[in-house]
Swiss-Prot record:
Name this polypeptide is given: Putative uncharacterized protein C2orf48
Domain of life: Eukaryota
Chain intervals with Basic and acidic residues compositional bias: 1-13
Location of the region described as Disordered in the Swiss-Prot/TrEMBL record: 1-35
Amino acid sequence: MESRPSGRQHASEGDGDQSPTQCAGMRSSGRSDQPYVLKGNPLLLRVRCYSGCASGSGRQLQLSVFQDLNQFSHCRVWRSPALIVKGEPPWCSQQDTQSPFQTGTPLERPCFRMKLSGWELTKNAQRALGSKLQHILSLDSTQACGAGGPTILRPPRAP
């Protein structure tokens, strides 16, 4: 049920310059001026490289990442949980019907780092996305601030 132009090119070929190492190297400034464009027809995901622990005024940086992620997660509105718990993520409060992410799915915690990789979503999200997205943005929701480990942008769990 897609109205977007179709295409079957695989973005995993010829993307050698989009390396996690490059992205992680932006730590000194906290972000990259040049967004990484992850191509997966017909989806186009624009992200920026961030690392470290975002808190206080850093929340603005968080939200700018989420705005870039809208094309992938299809979240239209972001809000904090009703009961704010320190270290807990903003939540997606609205959802596009084609998104593998349900309303209320926590997509990120304040401490995160970017990683480009293929197929780190669960089977549920893989089915929803098919072969249209060869690389995804992974955000950490498990490691402590400063750990800087690879991470996963997680779809909803099966009941």
